[in-house]
Swiss-Prot record:
The gene is nqrA. This is Na(+)-translocating NADH-quinone reductase subunit A. Keywords: Ion transport, NAD, Sodium, Sodium transport, Translocase, Transport, Ubiquinone. It comes from Alcanivorax borkumensis (strain ATCC 700651 / DSM 11573 / NCIMB 13689 / SK2). One of its GO terms (molecular function) is oxidoreductase activity, acting on NAD(P)H, quinone or similar compound as acceptor. It holds the Pfam family NQRA_2nd. One of its GO terms (biological process) is sodium ion transport.
């Protein structure tokens, strides 16, 4: 077992019940362009077209052969584009009767002997290939490529996260089948990373290996697991995939159709009853959270408070791979001389508030940043929350000034936005390190 000694478990109120309930009916779903880094679509449908579940809706000009399919049957009611015509979302009104595209199905014994090309082709044709992510760069891999290893995390340490075991227990066989399929994509191991007391049987066997991680967030981040087990570089790539996506892949190959089921936790201080709900892939957040929020001006975040996106307007749908929706109150108000208050109801990593004497206290965080952008001040906060074997202050400085050579030497290629989310949270200068990292990664990739 690998113990993570640095990090931060954010003491935010609104943890979900660790049991699954039926969610509200979903009337629309969407494929969000922002879920796919560097993707440039060639549209295969128009507004008003009727599509089947699993039907091709666009392909990627940048990565030849990658197909994106519809998560539901129905009518395409909107294709939203933003600045420079960047695709924001393709919105589909869900039909009452769902027609779907079918694919080949296999028995458990057949899965173990499937040809790699056949596995890749079915994943690509169904659109489930887009569930895979590369390290470095965090992109959908090119069809025909082979990773050094594949990582699956069944440990989620994000604030207010649902325990993956709750979902996997209901779909254990499909999860095992999904791991078998993933093992056909690589000659290396398929790593299943779990917590020390995960209430699940072992999945190890054949190419599938297991490792336990314990400690504070980001102990559950796949970037942490990759750093300790199979570090990447410009000439070495690994892939990762979420635990619910492994289940979906398993069902695709055993049932011959796309699974649109998803379990998403409704969490946060503004949720009336935080709990896990059954819903659909890409569900509308308005449908999902209907009648579930406290009164007030609320912000819905698709994902964790540390690394989700603001689900509103043309992107008011759940991300393809998200496992939670977090509700926060908009922090419009400003507090006069708040920095000299005792801080019984305020949280800080540093020992500056009275709340430090109240271990276990949960806070109703809002969206306020408690100040505007200012100079980056190294006060030791980054080192407190960064468990990886890198120099965070030096790396962050290199990222801010765009020194890609230094950033590469300091370990930037091992990171994605989620790996720097705690650095963003504790930063006295209010820097958003996720977008800064992404700009640097784009430059590094372009320069080779």
């Amino acid at each position: 077992m690998i113990k993570i000694r640095k990090g931060l478990d954010l003491p935010i109120a609104g943890a979900p019940r660790q049991a699954i309930e039926e969610g509200h009916q979903v009337r629309s779903v969407a494929v969000l362009g922002g879920d796919y880094v560097g993707m440039k679509p060639t549209m295969e449908v128009r507004e008003g077209d009727v599509v089947k579940k699993g039907q091709l809706i666009f392909t990627d000009k940048k990565t030849e052969g990658v197909k994106y399919t519809s998560p539901a049957a129905g009518k395409v009611i909107a294709i939203n584009r933003g600045h420079k015509r960047v695709l924001q979302s393709v919105v589909i009104e869900v039909a009452d009767q769902e027609d779907e595209v079918t694919f080949a199905s296999y028995s458990a014994d057949q899965l173990r002997s499937l040809d790699r090309d056949a596995v890749q082709q079915q994943l690509v044709d169904s659109g489930e290939w887009t569930l895979l992510r590369t390290r470095p760069f965090g992109k959908v891999p090119a069809p025909g490529s082979t990773p050094n290893s594949v990582f699956v995390s069944i440990l989620d340490t994000n604030p207010l996260a649902l325990d993956p075991a709750v979902v996997i227990k209901e779909n254990e066989q499909a999860f095992r089948h999904g791991l078998t399929v993933l093992s056909r994509l690589t000659d290396g191991p398929v790593w299943v990373c779990r917590g020390p007391n995960t209430d699940l049987p072992s999945f190890a066997g054949g190419q599938v290996r297991e490792e336990a991680f314990s400690g504070k967030h980001p102990a559950g981040n796949v970037g942490t697991h990759i750093h300790y087990l199979d570090p990447v570089g410009l000439n070495k790539t690994v892939w990762s995939v979420g635990y619910q996506d492994v289940i979906a892949i398993g069902k695709l190959f055993t049932e011959g159709k796309i699974s649109s089921a998803r379990v998403v936790a409704l969490t946060g201080p503004q949720a009336k009853t935080p709990r896990a709900l059954r819903t659909r892939v890409g569900a509308s957040v308005d449908d999902f959270a209907q009648g579930e929020l406290k009164e007030g001006d609320n912000r819905l975040i698709s994902g964790s408070v540390l690394n989700g996106h603001n689900a509103r307007g043309p992107v008011a749908w759940l991300s393809r791979t998200t496992n939670q929706l977090t509700a926060l109150r908009e922090g419009h108000e400003r507090e006069l001389l708040g920095y000299i208050s005792p801080g019984a109801n305020r949280f800080s990593l540093m020992n500056i508030y009275l709340s430090k004497l109240m271990p276990g206290k949960r806070f109703n965080f809002t969206t306020t940043t408690n100040g505007s952008e200012r100079a980056m001040v190294p006060v030791g906060a980054y080192e407190e929350v960064m468990p990886l074997d890198i120099l965070p202050t030096q790396l962050l400085r290199a990222l801010i000034v765009g020194d890609t050579d230094s950033a590469t030497a300091l370990g930037a290629l091992e990171l994605l936005e989620e790996d720097l989310s705690l650095c963003t949270f504790v930063c006295p200068g209010k820097y958003e390190y996720g977008p800064i990292l992404r700009d640097n990664l784009t430059t590094i990739e372009a320069e080779g």
